[in-house]
Structure formats: C-alpha cells, structure tokens
Amino acid sequence: MEKKKILDAALAPRIISGVPTDGQPLSGGPLSWAWCHTTLKRWALMKTRPYKYPLSTEPPTPPSVPNSASVNHNTTTNTTLSYTRCHSTTYTKPLRERSSRPWTRSATISRLPPRSWTN
C-alpha cells in the first residue's frame, strides 16, 4: 500500500503535464494547448491592431486578376488601386486615432494661463 502511494506521487507530475506513463503525449497536452493559446493570442492581436502585429511579414497581396487576353492593363491597375486604397484606410485608421490624443492634450495645456500669473 505504501509503495503504491510513493509510485503515484512519483508519476503525478508526469500525468498532470499531459504525458501518461507509457510516454505517449495526450491529445490535449500542454504542447497543443500552448500552440493553440499562442495562435489565438496572435489572431486576437491581429484583429485589434493589424498594423502592429501582422500575421505574416509579407504585404497584403492584391486580388488576382484572371490572366486572359481580354483583360487589359487599365483594369489591372484599377483593381490594385482600389484594393490598396481600401487597405490603407484600415491600416492607418488606428494610427490617426492614436495621434489625435496628444493634440487635444496640448490644446488644453496651451489654454491655461502662464505659471507666473498663479505665483
């Protein structure tokens, strides 16, 4: 009985960490949980701050234009222009909002009388 308790205590940390006694990792082990957690975190950051934490380092690719003879150069440039215009607004909007805060703060400070008047 005492031997079994000692054995259970020795195996407890291994079982908790997601690795059973036979050495096969469980499907819901800490490795898969950590991977899932970091991926979800990355997605959440990308949704809230896309300009700061892009999912990949590559710039967003414009929509592919069908490679046929009927498509001329003008239609290709139009699609890429509209795409970049759409994306530039999405990426610069949070930056513009953030830069507007110190502007209002400085305006309120400049409205206050000089320090020499209060002394």
Curated annotation (Swiss-Prot):
Residue ranges, compositional bias (Polar residues): 81-92
Disordered, as annotated region: 55-119
Origin: domain of life: Eukaryota
GO annotations of cellular component type: cytoplasm
Name of the protein this chain belongs to: Putative uncharacterized protein YCL042W
Source organism phylogeny: Eukaryota, Fungi, Dikarya, Ascomycota, Saccharomycotina
